[in-house]
Amino acid sequence: MKKIETGAARPETFPEQWPGQCEVFSHFEYACGIPSILYAVTTYKENGLGNVCCGAWASFPGDGGGFYALVPLPASTHTLANIRRTGEFCVNFLPVRHFDALMRTVRQNGMEDDEFTEGGFTPEPARTVGAPRIAESFLTLEC
């Protein structure tokens, strides 16, 4: 395994993916942001259809006061609107074999798309919140 080594200056091995990327974000965010396990935040859309928002970059810290899911969720997403509307969601952790299925939910995520169906996932009721869980997940946080 090759170690990533970087200093204050952005190394040439970290090319910008879009103009000005490393002016907005530090190259350290890419060097230190190790991909985590696949997860998907699930909610119901306002029309009752399933919403699946996949991710692989997050932090799940905890202390005596609680356990927290720190996930990037842009303001323009259905997911954030759904969470603001209901106050409920699930964080579903999935094996890597579900990566392609999660990518289908990214490509088919309109208001009229049931993203569980698009990804081939089985929705199941959560035990403590009104948001749906993904039955194929090996761990779900109900929030």
Model feature map: region roles:
Residues M1-N51, S59-E142:
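Active-site-proximal mixed secondary-structure blocks
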Residues G55:
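Core nucleotidyl-transferase/polymerase catalytic module
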